[in-house]
Amino acid sequence: MKNNIMIMNFSGVYEMQGLKTALEKKVDSVVAEAENMAAKPVITQLDFQDIPGTNCYCDSLAEEEIGKRIIPFGPEGLHFLDSGNYHYLTKLWLELVKEPFELLVFDHHTDMQCPAFGGILSCGGWIREALETNDNLKHVILVGPPQAAMEETKKELAEDGEELLGKVTWISEEEFLQNVEKPNWIQKLCGQCNVTGAEADEKEQLPLYISIDKDILSESEGKTNWDQGNVVLDQVLQFIDVYMQQTPGRQFIGMDICGEDPEADNEEVQTVCRKTSEKICGFFLC
């Protein structure tokens, strides 16, 4: 897997945070301590503010243009997507994966709303659209939405048939948090997700792509522009670590993060958000 880093600028929030400079320092620190890192990660910042029709909903022209700009980079690496309004960008990165794979999503929302406005890609329905249109996406693990929201989404998916419903493993915020104090709680939850794709080798697991929306986290770890959950970042990172350990040799494709709040002009708030991004970056590189 390539360990390069992409910062996607739609709202200007990353410039407000000074994220690129902070990540450069983080990379230098990790490289200095690493003993076997093949190459120093490259940080690329691309500006998309010239593309209209991207906020919350992504029209077909914008989707095509964004897709063209990210093709040269491939799906590998760590991608910063801006606010949760742009979480649909994950779908575009997934379209660059050219083999069967699995998607692990941490989000306070299901992001599986029925298409609206003529089926335009949206931040609220991108997972559903990816399941419907990406033949290589074999399985989705969704961690973090409230139980009630999950049950409502399951009903909506069931109305369209059992095929989509059968491709999703659900872990609600309530289930995730109620196991925190139990021994081996992460192993137990990961065990629910340990699914081998039908097209994968019987001895291996499908390659994995991970997407994190910071709105799964409590506001103490970063304020977003959406309603938020109560999960702690360390719990998310530990879950990922244990899940990967349960399938030795699994290919890790890449990861993305969204969930900034461009409207928060408080320097302290943006600093907390940036530090959360730095922590995720450090985890990714190690």
Model-inferred region functions:
Residues 118-121, 231:
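Glycine- and acidic-residue-enriched helix-capping/strand-helix junction motifs
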Residues 2-81, 85-102, 125, 135-286:
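Catalytic cores of soluble, metal-dependent hydrolases
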Residues 103-115, 126:
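Long, hydrophobic, well-ordered secondary-structure blocks that form the structural core
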